Amino acid sequence: MGNPKKNSKDFAPNHIGTQSKKAGGNKGKQMQDQTGKQPIVDNG
């Protein structure tokens, strides 16, 4: 129980930190891409 708890704690902050950084970068890039992709998607 001690092992999984330690692993989970290390994984939780690591995952959130990585996701936050990835989401922020992806969101920024996607937002700009959405401007040009939105009309294409609407057309499609």
UniProtKB/Swiss-Prot annotation:
Keywords carried by this UniProt record: Sporulation
Swiss-Prot/TrEMBL induction comment: Expressed only in the forespore compartment of sporulating cells.
Q: What's a GO cellular component annotated to this UniProt protein?
A: endospore-forming forespore
- Compartments (UniProt record): Spore core
List the GO biological process terms. Answer: asexual sporulation; sporulation resulting in formation of a cellular spore
User: Record's InterPro entries?
Assistant: SASP_SspN (IPR012612)
Organism domain of life: Bacteria
Ranges for the region named Disordered are 1-44
Q: Which NCBIfam families match?
A: PRK09398.1
Give the family, as the similarity comment puts it: Belongs to the SspN family.
| Name of the molecule in the record | Small, acid-soluble spore protein N
